[in-house]
């Protein structure tokens, strides 16, 4: 594995750990969800790097996934939800698309679960 790919995965793992710790507190669903999005983004960018391409300077998971969908298959609906989260959880309620401005506990848990599965998938694919 190329060193730059390993770096992306190490940063993804850090975001995943943060998300896992934060999601246990119902008042921290926003940062838990944000770190889930960041984990997913870094996992996808690791795959882009492994293909010898430069990752785009974007946080749009759908766009990044479009570069790697022949290599891995993931739930695009979840990527779309995480795209919304990236903006929604960083600004006051009413500025984003979420009804209450923050994800529910269940949504945050789903985001962490998705980030975990994506991290494992990418790690397994790139380790072989």
What role is predicted for each listed range?
Residues 1-128:
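Terminal alpha-helical segments
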């Amino acid at each position: 594995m190329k060193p730059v790919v390993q770096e992306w995965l190490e940063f993804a793992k850090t975001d995943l750990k943060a998300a896992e710790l934060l999601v246990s507190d119902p008042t921290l669903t926003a940062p838990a969800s944000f770190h889930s999005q960041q984990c997913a983004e870094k996992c996808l960018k690791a795959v882009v790097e492994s293909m010898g391409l430069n990752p785009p300077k974007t946080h749009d998971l759908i766009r990044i996934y479009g570069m790697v969908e022949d290599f891995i298959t993931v739930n695009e609906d979840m990527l779309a939800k995480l795209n919304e989260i990236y903006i929604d959880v960083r600004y006051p309620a009413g500025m984003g698309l979420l009804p209450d401005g923050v994800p529910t506990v269940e949504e945050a848990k789903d985001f962490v679960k998705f980030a975990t599965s994506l991290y494992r998938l990418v790690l397994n694919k790139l380790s072989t």
